[in-house]
């Protein structure tokens, strides 16, 4: 790919329904998340549900800055998609209904062309196609520079609630669930290993400037209040370029 083609691919928007962002539960690695978002960025407003999306290993390497290691990118992509096929995606539909599905219906690998063909689960159609209202979009490049899986998930969530107001209050348990960090029982561990690194990357690479305050019930921290404003994009763009071109 030319530098221009790489830049254009990175500048594509990821668009998802807010319900999917705010109510989904899954356990994916950083690179598995990037692969999913990379594929979502390929959806255009004119695509019909059931559309197949094809990408080459070389394209994924260059756009997402996957470190090339002796031609192993093909195996890395294969392994990621294999893992994705075993990790369910849960979406809370109503108080009494939960959808359990996967991101993709099928993955077809073509060794002759070194490409992969994917199509999204039909159950995700309402959250990915023909979006008119109550959806969130962001530039793919904003998450490609991130090195923490928690950064990606927190950024998605904060983008989806940004228009609700300058401040956003969320319980600690719900925040851990949104970030996939339920394994941190102690707040200190969660703050040091998940929340702080995520906010550092969000404030370095994205279009959001985020601060927070801890809220207590008695002596125990039980909620986080985020302050979310638009960031100075030119400086963030330079930070992303440095990270992606290392």
Regions found by a protein language model. Name each.
Residues 1-246:
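Charged, alpha-helix-forming regions
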């Amino acid at each position: 790919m030319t530098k221009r083609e790489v830049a254009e691919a990175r500048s594509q928007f990821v668009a998802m329904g807010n319900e999917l962002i705010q109510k989904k539960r899954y356990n994916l690695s950083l690179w598995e998340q990037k692969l999913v978002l990379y594929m979502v960025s390929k959806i255009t407003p004119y695509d019909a549900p059931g559309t197949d999306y094809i990408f080459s290993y070389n394209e994924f390497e260059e756009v997402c800055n996957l470190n090339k290691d002796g031609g192993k990118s093909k195996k890395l992509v294969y392994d990621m998609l294999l893992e994705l096929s075993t990790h369910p995606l849960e979406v809370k539909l109503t108080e009494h209904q939960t959808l359990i599905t996967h991101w993709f219906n099928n993955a077809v690998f073509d060794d002759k062309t070194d490409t992969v063909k994917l199509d999204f689960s039909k159950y995700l159609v309402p959250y990915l196609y023909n979006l008119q209202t109550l959806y969130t979009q962001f530039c793919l490049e904003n998450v490609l520079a991130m090195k923490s899986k928690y950064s990606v998930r927190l950024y998605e969530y904060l983008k989806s609630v940004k228009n609700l107001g300058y401040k956003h209050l969320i319980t600690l348990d719900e925040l851990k669930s949104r970030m996939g960090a339920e394994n941190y029982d102690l707040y200190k561990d969660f703050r040091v290993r998940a929340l702080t690194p995520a906010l550092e990357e969000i404030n370095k690479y994205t279009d959001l400037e985020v601060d927070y305050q801890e809220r207590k019930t008695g002596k125990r921290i039980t909620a986080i209040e985020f302050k979310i404003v638009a960031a100075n994009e030119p400086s963030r763009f330079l930070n992303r370029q440095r990270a992606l071109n290392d």
